[in-house]
Amino acid sequence: MSLDTAIFAGGCFWCMVQPFDTYPGIEKVESGYTGGHVANPTYEQVCSGTTGHTEAVKITFDPDKISYKDLVEIYWHQTDPTDASGQFQDRGDNYRPVIFVKNDEQRKIAEKSKKALQESGRFGDAKIVTTIEDVQPFYPAEDYHQGFYKKDPQRFALEEAGGRQQFIEKYWKNN
């Protein structure tokens, strides 16, 4: 079994773990920070907006069971790709939506998927602003952030209630 990785940023990383964690072929979903200029940042540093990092998830998967293309589709269903300034109640550059790609194959898949989403008209005239960027070093978040939806389901539910679930239902309910 040869495993691969994918990195996605879509707002609060707490809300990005559970949607991927439930699929066959997903070996691990890790919360962390990427895209910035500070090595080994802390949560507090990232939240301060001074590191350039965004909260993200690193997904380790078996491409024989789930494809990178499938992961990109799951990603779109978890984010507001028309909002470059954060996601839902989480605002700021550290919550920006990004698909981090590690090679030309991932880039082609992500760009094709983004173009198809734009052309679908699902979001009306709104532009799909999620960026596709080269992968940067990924720094795992502190242990208390890992698998947060399992550790603190009540607090996780409050985070999910901040507009994400309503958005998903509005735009993806029948899909």
Swiss-Prot record:
Reaction equation(s) it catalyzes: L-methionyl-[protein] + [thioredoxin]-disulfide + H2O = L-methionyl-(S)-S-oxide-[protein] + [thioredoxin]-dithiol; [thioredoxin]-disulfide + L-methionine + H2O = L-methionine (S)-S-oxide + [thioredoxin]-dithiol
Superkingdom of the source species: Bacteria
Active-site positions on this chain: 12
InterPro entries: Met_Sox_Rdtase_MsrA_dom, Met_Sox_Rdtase_MsrA_sf
Enzyme's top EC category: oxidoreductase
Pfam families associated with the record: PMSR (PF01625)
Keywords assigned: Oxidoreductase
GO MF annotation list: L-methionine:thioredoxin-disulfide S-oxidoreductase activity; peptide-methionine (S)-S-oxide reductase activity
Gene Ontology biological process terms, A to Z: protein modification process
E.C. number: 1.8.4.11
UniProt family annotation: Belongs to the MsrA Met sulfoxide reductase family.
NCBIfam families associated with the record: msrA
Role, per record: Has an important function as a repair enzyme for proteins that have been inactivated by oxidation. Catalyzes the reversible oxidation-reduction of methionine sulfoxide in proteins to methionine.
Protein name listed in UniProt: Peptide methionine sulfoxide reductase MsrA
Lineage: Bacteria, Bacillati, Bacillota, Bacilli, Lactobacillales
Gene name per UniProt: msrA
